[in-house]
């Protein structure tokens, strides 16, 4: 019988394990601060727990609408209009089980083999894995504490190639906690338009 590993798809064989999965390495240290996942240290609000419990008792324990609950979709559209002053069609609101699942699906939807997506480092460890499993290439633009984690336009321009398809933005940033102000975003707009880049944002925080 051939080795078990040979049954595993090559895209997974060639993918490095994420930091959060390297339990042997983590076990060697006693003072590790886990910045890999945004798992809050407070209990979910009673109103949410009570509502979920009440809905479960009422029978809402089965598969729902595959496109997501219509009330939830309407709420997302309303929030987009309130927060960003942008109308959003319900047909453009897919709902996923988590932001990580959503980002993985976006990568699969937009990246062809060899396409590049640029991320600003440091970044959440899953971004690279998701891009590579979709057949893409993850390019990094470094940011530094000594510069207030600011995005350097020259570094960004230098990282863009003819295969660059998307720019990934995640602020407040995990793990640095950096915030991108409105004027910082505005500086990126000419570069994005010049190179016709898709912008993917992770706004979990």
Residue ranges of model-derived segments:
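Active-site phosphate-binding strand-loop segment of PLP-dependent enzymes
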Residues: 139, 145-205
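A short helix-loop-beta submotif of the ANL/AMP-binding
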Residues: 133-139
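Conserved PLP-anchoring active-site segment centered on the Schiff-base-forming lysine
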Residues: 109-131
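Helix C-cap/helix->beta junction micro-motif
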Residues: 29, 134, 194-195
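Residue-level signal for alpha-helix termini/capping positions
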Residues: 27, 57, 111, 160-161, ...
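Short acidic capping loops at alpha-helix termini that bridge into adjacent secondary structure
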Residues: 87-93, 113-116, 163
